Regions:
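Extended, charged low-complexity segments
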Residues: 238-298
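Short histidine-centered loop motifs in beta-beta connectors
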Residues: 88-109, 275-281
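Generic structural motif
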Residues: 49-57, 109, 216, 220, ...
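Conserved, short, structured surface segments that act as functional micro-motifs
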Residues: 67-71, 108-168, 296
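Zn2+-dependent peptidoglycan hydrolase active-site motif and core
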Residues: 55-97
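Short, well-structured beta-strand-loop connectors
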Residues: 46-57, 100-115, 285
Length: 298
């Protein structure tokens, strides 16, 4: 059973991704990362609840050991309100140090606590809430096992020719001015694949990604059919339904390899291609050409 996240849930956040993660909890688009708006320093701490409901439990959980982050995170379980769109299900939220406790009633958009960065985060990942939805009889503590998620909003595919100028940088990433959001705040957008649909995921530094906003073709038996996915003529991988298995490929910026591209859906004015590049640095204003080279071309 798939669960649809309505516009009232998603509209609270500036960005989201179903597939941009290395963790099995996101396999098949069974979890979503929700990114609130950022503060002046590029980070955010507020953690707006995706739903109204009652907090069932909060607990501290282990996180992968990383030299730059704590080895613990926090899990919040919420029973959605009976009048809400996710009534009868269990909502699980990670990456929030809770200011709420079991039995507390929360409204949609009310802060659950303070967003935190644990060992689940790669250094280039912005603060966000990790959200999954389960049937009430499912184990709420296991990392994997949440229900597949569908989007109750449309995401506009933006064509991108692979070029842009650097507008911001960090220690491990650079952001380009293209593709630019044509109407910030009004709708979610994402990078368009050559044959339609919106690309979602870490290419190729995570194992796979997603192709949103395009109905999956079916074979003669009515089952989802596989199809090749490309960007600017560069083959990225093969989609089975909406899930893409990336090829053995390398992303290059001005002809030199980088870790990859971060692909997501956004409605903020700062949307643009995000290069993951801890091994390289770029200057603001620098013109960059991005390509994807398959193993056969290397």
């Amino acid at each position: 059973m798939a669960v649809t996240l309505p516009e009232s849930v998603l509209a609270q956040y500036e960005r989201f991704s179903l597939y941009n993660s290395p963790y099995p909890a996101h396999d098949g688009g069974c979890a979503i990362d929700l990114y609130p708006g950022t503060l002046a320093d590029g980070r955010t701490t507020a953690a707006p609840s995706p739903v109204a409901g009652t907090v069932r439990e909060t607990r501290t959980v282990r996180a992968p050991p990383k030299p730059y982050a704590p080895e613990h995170d926090h899990l919040i379980l919420i029973d959605p309100a009976a009048s809400g769109p996710l009534a009868g299900l269990t909502v699980r939220v990670l990456h929030v140090e809770p200011s709420v406790a079991a039995g507390d009633r929360v409204e949609r958009g009310e802060s659950l606590g303070r967003l935190v960065r644990a060992g689940f985060f790669a250094p280039w990942v912005d603060n966000h809430l990790h959200v999954g939805v389960r049937d009430p009889d499912q184990n709420p503590y296991r990392a994997s096992g949440s229900l597949p998620l569908e989007l109750g909003v449309s995401v506009r595919p933006l064509e991108w020719d692979g070029t842009g100028r650097v507008v911001s940088t960090g220690d491990t990433y650079a952001v380009l001015d293209s593709p630019a959001h044509p109407d910030p705040g009004a709708a979610f957008v994402g990078v368009r694949a050559d044959d339609g649909g919106v690309l979602d995921g870490g290419l190729p530094h995570y194992d796979g990604g997603g192709l949103l906003e395009r109905p999956a073709p079916v074979d003669t038996a009515g089952a989802p059919a596989e199809r090749v996915v490309s960007l600017n003529g560069d083959r990225l991988g093969v989609a089975d339904g909406r899930t893409i298995a990336w090829d053995d490929a390398t992303v290059t910026a001005n002809g030199e390899p980088i870790t990859g591209l971060s692909l997501f859906c956004a409605r903020d004015a700062d949307f643009g291609a995000k290069l993951i590049c801890p091994e390289r640095s770029f200057e603001r204003g620098e013109l960059v050409r991005v390509r994807v080279r398959s193993s056969d071309e290397r």
